[in-house]
Amino acid sequence: MLRRSVRISPDLVLRAYRQGLFPMAETRQSHRLYWLDPERRGVLPLDRFHLSRRLRRTVLSDLYEVTTDHDFAATIAACAAPAPGRPETWINPEILHLFTQLHRLGYAHSVECRREDVLVGGLYGVAIGGVFFGESMFSTARDASKVALVHLVARLQLAEFKLLDTQFLTAHLAQFGAEEISREAYRAVLAAALEAPSAWPTAPDPETLRAALSQL
């Protein structure tokens, strides 16, 4: 647990990620952050991503307009907000401030889904080397967060990322092939992936992206 007198900077957060730790607050109203280092870590193997036929049809139907980094502030705010079945979140004002700074520095990124110009789903996380650290997602329309995740995976594959860290394993993520690995195994995979010369794909060619989505 971090004391209030400790100044948490974007640089400290990046150094923590490189060591396998990540920050969370207990509630949206909490004034304290915790560094988490789970014994079992959730990861989503990029080479074994599972996509159902129904969801593939939804993704390729262009039901949603999918963008990246077009509205990071709105995306993280939506992730922080209570939702049906999720009355509380761990994203407090300090998390919002830190990750907004990381976005301005080029490390934190968002994937947004819109329908009729309304933001209805998305996710955000941090990219360092060949690792994308997924933080949170939200959805106010059917499959919107799932579509954002599928687009994220396609983009990470195109950019030759090596690791998608989901922090914890959930039933929602397990349907896509997410799994748990030990802390020791995670640190080994993390160290190797951080050395990869990957870069966040800012604007992949639309035809190349659609081909990547079709092959998932």
Please report, for each region that a protein language model flagged, where it lies by residue:
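N-acyltransferase acceptor-side catalytic subdomain
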Residues: 1-216
